[in-house]
Amino acid sequence: MKYDLIIIGSGSVGAAAGYYATRAGLKVLMTDAHMPPHQQGSHHGDTRLIRHAYGEGEKYVPLVLRAQALWDELSTHNEEPIFVRSGVVNLGPADSAFLANVARSAQQWQLNVERLDATALMTRWPEIRVPDNYIGLFEADSGFLRSELAITTWLRLAREAGCAQLFNSPVSHIHHDDNGVTIETSEGCYHASKALISAGTWVKALVPELPVQPVRKVFAWFKADGRYSTKNRFPAFTGEMPNGDQYYGFPAENDELKIGKHNGGQLIQAPEERKPFAAVASDGAEAFPFLRNVLPGIGGCLHGAACTYDNSPDEDFIIDTLPGHENTLVITGLSGHGFKFAPVLGEIAADFALGKTPSFDLTPFRLSRFSQ
C-alpha cells in the first residue's frame, strides 16, 4: 500500500498532522519510536504555556492565533478542557527586550495585554514579589494546555478517522526516489508520496545535516496552597531575572506548583545522556533564585522530570522541505517554545501533503537562513 503521507515522529506536531491530514481525506501512516504520549521527548509533564503576545517575535503571532482557534476546537472533543484560560503574566525589568517584544506584538495585533507596574502587580497578586523597576504584562486570554491529553486526543481522533498508526517502531532509514518516500522500520518498509519528519530531539539520527542541538532540561513541582491556584485567579507566568535568566510556571494544582527554567540546561548528544531528574546536582535548586525572590511563599521541591529541547542555532523554528527533496517536510528546532504551535504546525504539514500553499509566511523558518 502506498500512503499519501508518512509521519516520522508522532509527538506534538506529528500527532496533530496525523489528525488534520486524515481528516482532510488523505491516507496517512503515523510512526513513532515509542508509544505516544511518552516520556522520551518534549511533550510530557502535563502542562505547557500558550502566550499570544509573543516575546520571541511578532512573526509567531499569526501562527499562535491560528493555533489558539485549533486548540479551542480540539477542546470540544473532550469533557476535560485541553486549554485552560488562566491568563499569563509576563514579569521582568521594565527595560527587558523580551517584554518589549511582548508589548510590540500586542500593539501590532491589537491583543488584550495589560501593563502593570510593580505596585499594581503585587496588589493584584499579593503572592508575587518584584523589585520596583519591574513590570508585568498580563495576557488575560492566554493560559495553559494539557499537553499529554492533547496528544492522546489527536491520536484517538486520527485513528477513528482511519489513520494507520505504527508505534514502538523506530524508523532506521529514509529513502527518496521518483515515486516518493520509503521508510525502513523494524516492522518492514512503507511507502508514501510525501513525508513529514517531526522526530523532535533526535531528528539528526535521520537527517544528520540539520542544525539541531539537543539540550537536557528539567522542570519541577513545589509545595503550594490554594492561594496559587486558578480558583484564586492566580495566573500562569513567565519571569525574567535581573541577570537575564528566564523562568516559566503554572497555577498550582493539588497543592503543587510547576516551574522550570527556560535557558541553560546540559548539551547532550545521545538519548542515554538525558539523565533523570535529580541526576544533576543543580536540578532541584534550579528554580530557587526565582522562587526565593518572586514567589517566596512556595515551599520545597516535591518531584521533577527531565525533558529535551531541540534547539536551532537562533532558537527559531525550522519549517522547510529537505534540500533536494521537495516531497519531505521537516519541522524541528522548536527550541523549547513549540508545543503551543502544534496544531497549526500540524495543519501546515497537512496542507503540504495536500499540495496547498501555506497560509502563513514561513520565510523566517527556512533552512536557508543558516547559510546566508
From Swiss-Prot:
Name under which the protein is recorded: N-methyl-L-tryptophan oxidase
GO cellular component: cytosol
Transmembrane segments: none
Family named by the database record: Belongs to the MSOX/MTOX family. MTOX subfamily.
Gene name in the database record: solA
EC identifiers of the protein: 1.5.3.-
Gene Ontology molecular function terms on file: flavin adenine dinucleotide binding; N-methyl-L-amino-acid oxidase activity; sarcosine oxidase activity
Residues reported to bind FAD: 4-34
The protein's role, per its UniProt record: Catalyzes the oxidative demethylation of N-methyl-L-tryptophan.
S-8alpha-FAD cysteine: residues carrying this PTM: C307
Classification via Pfam families: DAO
Keywords carried by this UniProt record: FAD, Flavoprotein, Oxidoreductase
